[in-house]
Amino acid sequence: IVHSMAHGLSALYDTPHGVACAIILPTGLEYNKTAAGERYRAVGKAMGVTGIDEMNDVEAADATIAAVKKLSADVGIPADLKGILKEEDVQFLAESAFADACCPGNPRDTSVEEIKELYRSLM
């Protein structure tokens, strides 16, 4: 979902694609946590999250998401799309993300309405 949502942002707002992905990543991780939380342990382990092997899947996912947010902040990635994303573009962006070739690879089924809410949560 992250990559799909970032494509439209990059095109519409001339935001570098990697930056758009990084801004959206924590939101996408939260969104997919229930469908792929167990996969987050490997990411957290690679990021050096302390004690991750002793955590249950939910704790490991939360710790990994926190580590991603910290890394983003440490390298100056904005935490949201305030001042970038406009409400009048949300419908178009959500429809584009839903139709994007990357969307079917998301671990959780989604909808245009859910993607709209994800964008709005970043405003």
Predicted regions, residues:
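C-terminal charged capping/lid subdomain of soluble metabolic enzymes
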Residues: 40, 44-46, 50-123
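Active-site segments that bind and position negatively charged phosphate/pyrophosphate groups
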Residues: 1-67
